[in-house]
């Protein structure tokens, strides 16, 4: 796009120019970590955030008892960058190991009916192979992936030698001899990545599994942590440490870059100039920003086609411990509109349930997003009450979040489709002029929050000229 054309998108009148060494777009973990590193090295850094808060896809629901998470649920003891940052800024960490046994106890719901675990091996819908009939459906898939994962290192998913595995989960499972009925049971039910097994790369899931295994191999006695006050406390602490206050409500609409300078235009008319720009926003958001000169080739295809996981979360406070009436666990793994229900245990005693969270992913999130928020909440609660009559009138909805409907994320974690890793995996983080890219979707060796931190570190080193 020519300079005159890019100028045409500037709101009128353009406000006073703001000059920095580096402008970071997005105040999530990756952007704030990059800003922190660069400020430590003496750079003048300005962070722009379109939302009303910092944290990005780390979202603590502070209106709910115990501050449960709608994004960035917990993190392992091997998340070195995240833990070091929390300790640097005196964010207290809470060991979640005591609650893990409670989390592992889930009720299984098939065809709108709770199936006692003792009855699962002989259930007519149990299509697991002989010798595996007792395994919980979702855990069977993880077992199969672990037993067949060829990746010897977490970054090996980007090695061309493994690109033959950049096929759909469905195709790979069929090649292992599994029928459609089994794939629907162990993968498509409460799907964690994508909308179906047909739209997700198996190579990506080998990466996910390799990362989980690498964390386990570290041998820590602690299962994981959350932060006091919610995990959002960590990005908030990073933001508070910055010399320049994070600029909220700054929706970037255009970036132009030259050999040694860049200009950033916001929807409110403000204009920022810097030698370097760091874009930490998801590609689903980045593709709506006008960039001049235009990005072309595989990187442009990545920006336009890499998707993010559809995920909704409903937080509910129980008016009474209804699970004590029916003698079942409050946790449920269902094939109903209730999705996956998790009891949050944020009190001093792990036996105390402070709230319940319904995880609503993939096609279920799609269905709910077509409803009004009130109707979506009502349909989920109605589903829970149908499955658990003891829960009737016992659930108070207190927070609901759709990541796809959030205009600053349009989904949660990145989803690599079949063939996309081979096609443009090596190009997603390539600098474009003075524009650099980070975010969980550009991480190579780590997942989740640590992946975001990895990418923030990498992009800061790019700006510093170290890599």
Task: Enumerate the predicted regions with their spans.
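Conserved flavin/dinucleotide-binding core of flavoenzymes
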Residues: 6-10, 261-263, 310, 325-467
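N-terminal Rossmann-like FAD-binding beta1-loop-alpha1 element of flavoenzymes
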Residues: 20-47
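Short hydrophobic core segments
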Residues: 25, 48, 252, 271-285
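Glycine-rich FAD pyrophosphate-binding loop
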Residues: 39-62
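Mobile amphipathic helical/loop "lid" adjacent to a hydrophobic cofactor/ligand pocket
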Residues: 87, 94-198
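Active-site/ligand-binding neighborhood in enzyme catalytic cores
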Residues: 149-251, 258-261, 415-416
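Conserved beta-strand-loop-beta-strand element in the redox core of flavoprotein oxidoreductases
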Residues: 256-271
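Flavin (primarily FAD) binding-site architecture
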Residues: 279-297
């Amino acid at each position: 796009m020519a300079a005159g054309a890019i100028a045409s998108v500037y709101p009128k009148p353009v406000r006073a120019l703001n000059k920095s060494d580096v402008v970071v777009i997005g105040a999530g973990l990756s952007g704030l970590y990059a800003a922190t590193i660069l400020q430590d090295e003496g750079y003048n850094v300005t962070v722009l955030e379109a939302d009303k808060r910092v944290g990005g896809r780390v979202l603590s629901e502070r209106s709910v008892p115990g501050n449960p998470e709608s994004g960035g649920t917990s993190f392992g003891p091997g998340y070195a960058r995240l833990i070091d940052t929390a300790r640097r800024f005196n964010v207290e960490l809470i060991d979640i190991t005591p609650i893990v046994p409670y989390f592992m106890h889930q009720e299984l719901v098939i065809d709108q009916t709770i199936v006692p675990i003792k009855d699962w091996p002989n259930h007519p819908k149990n299509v697991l192979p002989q010798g595996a009939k007792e395994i919980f459906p979702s855990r069977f898939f993880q077992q199969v992936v672990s037993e067949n994962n060829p990746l010897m290192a977490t970054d090996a998913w980007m090695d061309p030698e493994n690109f033959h595995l950049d096929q759909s989960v469905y195709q790979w499972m069929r090649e292992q001899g599994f029928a459609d009925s089994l794939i629907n049971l162990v993968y498509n039910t409460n799907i964690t990545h994508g909308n179906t097994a047909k739209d997700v790369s198996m190579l990506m899931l080998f990466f996910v599994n390799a990362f989980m295994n690498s964390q386990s191999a570290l041998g820590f006695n602690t299962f994981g942590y959350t932060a006091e006050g919610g995990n959002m406390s960590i990005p908030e602490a990073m933001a508070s440490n910055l010399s320049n206050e994070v600029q909220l409500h700054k929706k970037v609409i255009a970036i132009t870059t030259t050999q040694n300078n860049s200009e950033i235009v916001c929807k409110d008319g403000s204009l920022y100039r810097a030698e370097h720009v760091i874009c930490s926003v998801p590609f689903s958001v980045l593709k709506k920003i006008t960039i001049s000169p235009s990005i072309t080739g595989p990187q442009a295809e990545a920006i336009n086609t890499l998707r993010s996981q559809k995920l909704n979360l409903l937080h509910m406070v129980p008016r009474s411990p209804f699970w004590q009436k029916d003698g079942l666990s409050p946790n449920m793994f269902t094939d109903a509109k209730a999705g996956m229900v998790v009891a949050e245990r944020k009190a001093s005693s792990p036996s105390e349930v402070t709230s319940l969270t319904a995880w609503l992913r993939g096609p279920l999130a799609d269905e709910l997003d077509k409803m009004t928020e009130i109707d979506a909440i009502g349909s989920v609660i109605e589903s829970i009450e149908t499955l658990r009559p003891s829960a009737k009138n016992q659930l108070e909805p207190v927070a609901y979040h759709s990541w796809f409907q959030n205009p600053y994320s349009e989904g949660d974690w990145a989803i690599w489709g079949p063939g996309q890793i081979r096609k443009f995996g090596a190009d997603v983080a390539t600098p474009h002029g003075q524009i650099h890219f980070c975010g969980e979707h550009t991480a190579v060796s780590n997942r989740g929050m640590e992946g975001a931190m990895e990418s923030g570190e990498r992009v800061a080193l790019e700006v510093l000229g170290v890599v």
